[in-house]
A protein has these predicted regions:
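C-terminal motif of bacterial Sec signal peptides marking the signal peptidase cleavage site
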Residues: 21-24
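Alpha-helical protein-protein interaction elements
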Residues: 14, 31-33, 108, 131
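Alpha-helical transmembrane segments
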Residues: 15-19
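Short cysteine/histidine-rich metal-coordination sites, predominantly Zn2+-binding motifs
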Residues: 103-113, 123-136
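Bacterial N-terminal signal peptides that target proteins for export
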Residues: 2-13
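N-terminal pre-ligand scaffold of iron-sulfur
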Residues: 28-104, 117-118, 122, 137-152
C-alpha cells in the first residue's frame, strides 16, 4: 500500500469519526418547571435539636418553612437516607392553597387535591386532560455526621 493511500485512509477515517461524534450529539432540553423558580441555598439540619425529632425515625418528615417557595419538606426514608422536596405544588404558580401537606409518604396539594409520592416525587393522580404534569421539585439532602444538609 502506498504512503498516499494510507494517508488518505487515515484522513477519511478521521473525518468519518468526527462526523459520527457531531451526529451522535443531541441537544436535549432539560424541561424546567415553569411555575417554580429554583433558588440556590444550603441549610444544615442538626438532628440533635428537638424541632427535628421527627426526622430521627424512618417515615418521619419536617417542613422547613424558611426555604424555597412554600418551604422544604425533608423526609427520612429508612433511618439513614433523606429526601428533600419543595413544599409548593409544582403544577401551578405558588398561591395561598399551594403548600402541600404531608401524611405518611403522601404529599397533597389542597388546590386540586393532587397527591405526590414522597419517595419518588411523582404525581399519583394526574388529571386525564393534562398535557404536562410536573413532579415535586427535588432538593439535595446529604447526611454529614449528626446533620442533614439540604441544598440546591
Amino acid at each position: 500500500m502506498s504512503d498516499l493511500t494510507l494517508f488518505l485512509k487515515k484522513k477519511f477515517l478521521s473525518a468519518l469519526f468526527t462526523a459520527f461524534l457531531f451526529l451522535s450529539c443531541s441537544s436535549t432540553d432539560l424541561e424546567r418547571n415553569p411555575y417554580l423558580a429554583e433558588y440556590s441555598f444550603q441549610f444544615p439540619i442538626n438532628l440533635n435539636l428537638p424541632e427535628y425529632n421527627d426526622l430521627k425515625l424512618a417515615g418521619g418528615s419536617v417542613l422547613i418553612s424558611q426555604l424555597g417557595h412554600k418551604g422544604v419538606i425533608v423526609y427520612n426514608i429508612n433511618g439513614n437516607t433523606f429526601l428533600a422536596w419543595e413544599a409548593s405544588c409544582p403544577n401551578h404558580a405558588p398561591s395561598s392553597c399551594s403548600q402541600i401537606q404531608v401524611s405518611d409518604f403522601i404529599a397533597e396539594c389542597s388546590c386540586e387535591e393532587y397527591q405526590y409520592n414522597l419517595l419518588t416525587g411523582q404525581l399519583l393522580n394526574p388529571p386525564a386532560d393534562a398535557e404536562t404534569v410536573y413532579p415535586l421539585l427535588f432538593y439535595r439532602a446529604e447526611v454529614r455526621g449528626n446533620s442533614v444538609v439540604v441544598s440546591n
